[in-house]
Amino acid sequence: MLDSVPGGALRDYLSVPLVDKGSDIHSLPLLSLDFETSGLDAKKDHIVSAGYVAIEAGVIQLSSARHELVRLDGALTEHSVVIHGITDDDVSAGEALEVVTGNLLRALAGKTMVAHHAKIELTFLTQACQILYGMSPRFPVIDTMRIAKRWLERRNKHIEQGDLRLFNLRKRYGLPMYQAHNALSDAIATAELLQAQIGHMDSSKTLPLRQFLS
């Protein structure tokens, strides 16, 4: 695949080997990612902002935190503005999709993606790569929502509507409130949730990456 990829951010990402799935989660480099979008359909909607932060050996690296707005040509819907608070003026001053995606891919190289309800991040990042590069790799991902769902199901816990939302899962683990629907705040909140989930597992055992991948 690498030979057919032109130089640039995607090639840089692909040139770094994926992490061994047997490696212990405690020692692995991760990147917690969140997108705010104009809607839920990656074919017709757009990434509005991207927030991400690295996790190295179980420690959230706040110095690596990044939040970027994506420049859009069209107007945002009133519904999406109410949710994420990003206005047309904000996105008109943002960076091009190519710049934001390139920065993200370089940050993600050699790391495993972490996201909450990762389907959103995966589908929109895949679509962005298709638009920009004509192709997209498969991105290994740890989905904190799926980890929580499996944990509850194994204990025969009834899952109510809303139980798997990031805000409610953080409450379950005693984590503090945070500013929801801001891409960087959500990315940091997701990183903290993953740390809490790992912390409630048997720390005396190796926890291989494959156990966490969606």
Language model features: what each stretch is:
Residues 2-139, 160-181:
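Conserved non-catalytic scaffold segment of RNase H-like nuclease domains
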Residues 35-39, 146, 189:
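Short, glycine/acidic-enriched loop or turn micro-motifs at the edges of active sites
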Residues 126, 191-198:
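Short, amphipathic alpha-helical segments that act as regulatory/interfacial helices
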Residues 142-160:
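Short alpha-helix plus adjacent loop in nuclease-associated cores
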Residues 182-193:
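Acidic, divalent-metal-coordinating active-site segment for phosphoryl/phosphodiester hydrolysis
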Residues 201-214:
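Mixed-charge, glycine-rich, non-catalytic linkers/tails in nucleic-acid processing enzymes
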